[in-house]
């Protein structure tokens, strides 16, 4: 009897142990399944259904490949749509839109493409009011709009230096004055002392120029380096070389301003699009035969046809801020913005 009870007790213990072990295995399996399921649901939530690069955003191939890991469908265009209907057709039901500074994304586009929840501007977003995207309307609809900054400034500064040196020394087809001259000792006025303007100012100082600046707000840190503030009228009168480094759609120079400049001046534009009234610039260049306007494809913008044949317009038909390095910086920052949006982690 004792032996039987001993065996029975052992069997009960064994059954209990097996049940407990089975339960543990079951719970472990269930936990693993739930983790896998929740993780995949999280990944689904973290991805876009459809990403559309609606025009030539300049993202490099590595970045375009990365888009495939965060979008179930990725459509990339390498040209610029000329009609709004084409913009709408390209975007379609996309929930992620990538766009350069050239293609307008108006309220009517947002109306026609209601699935958009993120707009990645592959360019600098200075102010909502000056953007090619209706940022204010987009944000009213809960659409996140993020831009990229500080990616092409180095190339722009190199362009300014190289074109000024060519003109001052006559290394190209024309020379500013009768004799070759250096930047050393020349008065250079910077209008807009943001990132690009500040870098141009530092480059001019390196070459020994006397640098003046005008900005909506005073820059004590720049003034501490010897970059002198001037009211706009004084800067236009005093400076021999004037460089506009302004946000898009800032038209600061009209006939009164050009009258203050007079002859034997050089105007360089690093901004996106003109910073002047076109007719006023044409009148100034027509009257002041020893003055020049320098710009690249970005600075010329939509006024190219009106200015390209004027002899003292020195136009470079390339984007000075575009280089291997700037495209890489642009691509990485555009991707970082997307990941920031998807993860909802503030960007440091």
Regions found by a protein language model. Give the residues of each.
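Glycine-rich NAD(P)-binding loop of Rossmann-like domains
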Residues: 170-202
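NAD(P)-binding Rossmann-fold cofactor-contacting core
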Residues: 206-223
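C-terminal helix-to-coil terminal segments
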Residues: 43-48, 55, 63-66, 139, ...
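N-terminal glycine-/charge-rich "phosphate-binding" loop or analogous flexible N-terminal tail
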Residues: 8, 17-21, 25-30, 35-94, ...
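Cysteine-centered motifs
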Residues: 13-14
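Phosphate/diphosphate ligand-binding glycine-rich loop within oxidoreductases
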Residues: 94-175
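Phosphate-coordination loops involved in phosphoryl transfer and adenosine-cofactor binding
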Residues: 48, 184-187, 264
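Rossmann-like adenosine-cofactor binding region
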Residues: 92-95, 104-109, 218-306
């Amino acid at each position: 009897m004792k032996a039987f009870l001993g065996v029975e007790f052992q069997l009960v213990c064994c059954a209990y142990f097996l049940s407990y072990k089975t339960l543990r295995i079951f719970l472990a399996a269930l936990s693993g399944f739930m983790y896998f399921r929740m993780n995949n649901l999280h990944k689904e939530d973290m991805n876009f259904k459809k990403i559309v690069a609606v025009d030539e955003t300049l993202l490099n191939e590595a970045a375009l490949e990365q888009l495939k890991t965060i979008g179930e469908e990725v459509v990339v265009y390498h040209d610029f749509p000329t009609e709004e209907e084409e913009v709408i057709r390209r975007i379609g039901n996309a929930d992620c839109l990538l766009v350069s500074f050239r293609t307008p994304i108006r309220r009517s586009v947002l109306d026609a493409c209601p699935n958009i929840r993120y707009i990645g501007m592959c360019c600098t977003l200075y102010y909502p009011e000056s953007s090619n995207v209706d940022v204010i309307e987009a944000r009213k609809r809960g659409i996140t709009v993020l831009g990229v900054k500080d990616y092409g400034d180095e190339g722009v500064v190199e362009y300014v230096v190289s074109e000024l040196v060519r003109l001052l020394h006559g290394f190209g087809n024309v020379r500013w004055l009768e004799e070759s001259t250096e930047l050393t000792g020349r008065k250079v006025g910077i209008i807009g002392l943001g990132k690009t303007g500040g870098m141009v100012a530092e480059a001019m100082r390196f070459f020994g120029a006397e640098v003046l600046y005008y900005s909506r707000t005073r820059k004590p840190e720049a003034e501490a380096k010897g970059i002198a503030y001037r009211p706009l009228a004084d800067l236009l009168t005093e400076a021999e070389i004037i460089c506009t480094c302004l946000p898009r759609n800032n038209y600061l120079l009209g006939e009164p301003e050009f009258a203050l400049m007079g002859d034997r001046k050089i105007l360089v534009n690093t901004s996106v699009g003109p910073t002047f009234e076109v007719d006023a610039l044409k009148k100034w260049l027509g009257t002041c035969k020893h003055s020049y306007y320098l710009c690249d494809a970005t600075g010329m913008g939509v006024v190219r046809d009106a200015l390209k044949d004027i002899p003292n317009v020195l136009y470079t038909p390339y984007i000075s801020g575009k280089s291997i390095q700037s495209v890489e910086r642009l691509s990485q920052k555009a991707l970082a913005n997307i990941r920031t949006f998807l993860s909802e982690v503030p960007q440091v």
